[in-house]
Regions:
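Flexible, glycine-/charge-rich segments associated with ATP-binding catalytic modules
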Residues: 1-30, 89-90, 192-196, 207-291
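Short amphipathic
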Residues: 1-7, 97-107
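Amphipathic alpha-helical interaction surfaces in cytosolic regulatory modules
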Residues: 5-88
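Conserved phosphate/pyrophosphate-binding and hydrolysis machinery centered on Walker-type P-loop NTPases
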Residues: 9, 42-45, 132-140, 219
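Conserved ATP-binding N-box helix of the HATPase_c
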Residues: 53-55, 131-168, 224-230
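A glycine-rich helix N-cap at a beta->alpha junction
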Residues: 85-101
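Helix-loop-beta hinge of the Bergerat
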Residues: 101-132, 185, 192-208, 228
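ATP-lid-like helix-loop hinge signature
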Residues: 150-191, 249
Length: 291
């Protein structure tokens, strides 16, 4: 079986639609040879490899053999610098400009490896806006909470996927984490004991300190802090889960329904690297508020 991708795969609503369409058309195949044709694809935002990789891993979990064919040179170069194509028979090439945040898959028990990964490949980049030590600590914990949420809430057995990219000409850095789990809608619906849409579930999960995490130590502050930070920074926060898509930018939020559901949850954060402001915490939060 062969499936073709469109001309552009960007980290936006249309990019999610393109990849979830691929999943919808291929997810029921078993023991097949599946070719993903990239002949028409002239641009692929590297951080979307987290989403693409999760989908292809899911297809492989159905005992299919998955191959990428007709990859154009520019796209091959992008996806070889971050190590994505090494999983599909290609050789990595040096990232001489140091703009790639490598594509990785983590098991749910790999929390220490993920922590080290975000520390070395994302947090310590000198392109990030200047932050106080306290805020940098909270920022790091908020990114880690995305992984923690995937472990605690998704019930995934196929792992957690991440990738990122610095775009110097556009003055931004994007980082994406995807899991193949039950999704936000199911978790929130069960917690509220009310069947709600995926859009409504994402909106609920991003409001104040709402969380489905139970016990004496609450969660939920991670997305709140990231949202407040990107409001000031001029960045963007996106979440896709099931057939829900949510985006926050320019201090406002919007949501849409995806035509084809994503089999888990994706969180994408985009940071404006042209931001010359310095940031500190406005309140003295306790580290235990997040974990």
């Amino acid at each position: 079986m062969r499936f073709a991708l469109p001309q552009l795969i960007r980290h936006d609503y249309e990019g999610f639609e393109a990849l979830t369409r691929l999943y919808a058309h291929a997810k029921d195949y078993h023991l097949e040879n599946i070719e993903i044709d990239l002949e028409r694809t002239r641009w692929f935002d590297a951080d979307m490899c987290a989403v693409f990789g999760a989908i292809l891993y899911s297809l492989g979990d159905n005992l299919n053999t998955v191959a990428l064919v007709n990859v154009l040179p520019d796209v091959e170069r992008i996806l070889s610098k971050n190590g994505f194509l090494s999983h599909y028979g290609k050789v990595n090439i040096p990232d001489s400009w140091e703009t790639a945040i490598s594509y990785q898959r983590f098991d749910v028990t790999d929390d220490r490896f993920f922590s080290g990964y975000i520390e070395t490949e994302f947090i310590h980049r000198n392109k990030l806006p200047e932050m106080s030590m306290g805020l940098m600590k909270k920022f790091r914990e908020s990114i880690f909470e995305i992984f923690s949420n995937a472990v605690l809430h998704s019930s995934t057995r196929m792992g957690i996927f991440s990738c990122g990219q610095l775009f110097p000409k556009q003055s931004k850095i994007d980082f994406t984490v995807a899991d193949l789990g039950v999704g936000i809608r199911q978790n929130v619906s069960e917690y509220l004991e009310d069947e709600i849409s995926a859009e409504q579930a994402i909106i609920w999960a991003t409001e104040k300190t709402n969380t489905t995490k139970e016990g004496p130590v609450p969660g939920g502050l991670g997305l709140k802090l990231l949202g407040e930070f990107i409001d000031l920074n001029g960045g963007c926060l996106q979440i896709a889960s099931d057939d829900g898509y949510w985006r926050r930018s320019n201090k406002s939020s919007s949501s849409l329904a995806l035509e084809y559901p994503f089999p888990g949850t994706v969180v994408n954060i985009e940071i404006n690297t042209a931001d010359t402001l310095s940031y500190i915490l406005s309140t003295d939060w306790d580290v235990d508020d997040i974990f």
